[in-house]
Amino acid sequence: MNTNQKSRENLRALVESSLLVALGFILSYITPFKLPWGGSVTPLSMLPILMIGIRHGLKWGLAGGFIYAGLQMIQQFWPPPTGTVGGYIAVVFLDYIAAFTILGLSGLFRGRKFGLLIAAPICTTLRYLSHFVSGIVVWGVYAQDMPVWLYSLTYNGSYMIPEIVLTTAVSAVLCITAPPVLFNMKKPAKVNEISDTSE
C-alpha cells in the first residue's frame, strides 16, 4: 500500500469513526429506563462503537471507545458518594474510560464473517464487568443490608443485561442479512470472475 492510499484509508477511517461515535452518542440520549445512581438502558448505543473496531481494527476501535467515554463523562458524570480523590479516579476509570474503551476490543474480530456477533456479547459483558467492579469499589455504600457484590451485580445488571441481549440480537440480524461491505469485508469473487482474471 503506497503513502497516498494509506492516507486515504486513514482519512476514511477517521471520518467513519467520527460518524459512528456521534451516532452512538445520539442514541445514548434515548433512555427508556434510568437508575438513580447512574446507569440507564440506552438501546443500541454501543453498537456503533463496536462497528468501529469491526470495520477498521483494534487501534481505531479503542480510540473511538475512548473518545466516546469522554463524551459520556461530559453528558452525565456521576460523582462518587464518598467524594474522595480515590473515589473520583475509580469512577472515571471504571465507569467511563475502561467501560467504554473496552467496546473497541471488537477490533480483535475484524475480518471474520460473524465477527460482530462474536464481539457484541464479549465486549458488552466486559463493560458490565467494569461497572460491576466499580459497584463494589465505589458504590457499595448503597448496598445497605445486601452483600456488596450482589448489589452491584443486580444494580448494574438491571440495565446492562437488556443492553447486552438487544445489542447481540441486532448484531446477529446484521451478520445474517447485511452485505459484507457493512463490515468492510470484500465480497467473495464469483467462480467465473476468478477464471477471467487468471486468463
For the regions a language model picked out, list residue spans one by one.
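Alpha-helical transmembrane segments and their cytosolic interface
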Residues: M1-V21, V148-E199
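Helix-capping/transition residues at the boundaries of transmembrane alpha-helices
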Residues: I52-I54, S106, R110
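Membrane-embedded alpha-helical segments of multi-pass transporters/permeases
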Residues: F25, Y29, M73-F77, L108, ...
